[in-house]
Amino acid sequence: DKVNGQQVLEMSGDDAMEFFRDQGYALQLAQQQQVLRLFRTEFDVWYSERHLHDSGAVERGFAALDAAGHTYDSDGAKWLRTSEFGDDKDRVLVKSDGEMTYFASDSAYYVDKRARGFDVNIYLLGADHHGYVGRLKAIAACAGDDPDFNIEVLIGQLVKIYRSGEEVRLSKRAGDIVTLEDLVDEGGVDAARYSLIRYPADSPLTLDLDLLVKRTNDNPVFYVQYAHARISSVLRHAADLGIDGQSAPFDASLLGEERERDLIGVIADLPRVVGSAAELREPHRV
């Protein structure tokens, strides 16, 4: 239901805080979804952490871990025995004051996803969360799964951005940031997608904003787009001549250049490369 300004003014402090929290959550989620649509990235499911708590999934997750004998109480807090499965220490699920930790949600979310039929759970973490890998795998082990199969963790590295030959200094605290939307606005969605996917996720990445908009072969995005345009032109010319690439006879003797044979080999290998890229979560291979 819509709430007018007067109703907001008449709310108690707690009600007003909850109202603005809900409004802020809805606004930020809508912005994130809009930017991802702009970036041509689609998620089949958007799962809220709030739903995890409201649906009882956290309690069900705790119950499953309790039943497996992997939780215990100490100093008024609830712990998970992650150190028995490779983590450097046990982790707190519920603090002594009753507040749940982030790790509690992570644990419950894993148990909930497995209950919903997801066999492999892929986590994409920032470079500063490398220490989280062990505890995520320990969650899988505590749930009776194989951490090496049921958990995949991809570690993303930092992105440096250059403009006019100088690094753009970023600071979240000062509000000096370059968003994904800014990147798309500067160079276009194709340039942004290609630039971010060109290297492995675990490699540091440098983006030159000036280079992204150059229409020269120095710009790898332009080079790929130019190659695509030339190939499309060849196919249109062949169609104008009545040549059907699917059924026309193939005369291999016309391919006398070594580069031509190499190119055919690369094209023939493309299905294997695409399959390997998907299996290894490494789209830069394509």
Segments (PLM) and residue ranges:
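Non-catalytic interaction-recognition regions
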Residues: 1-286
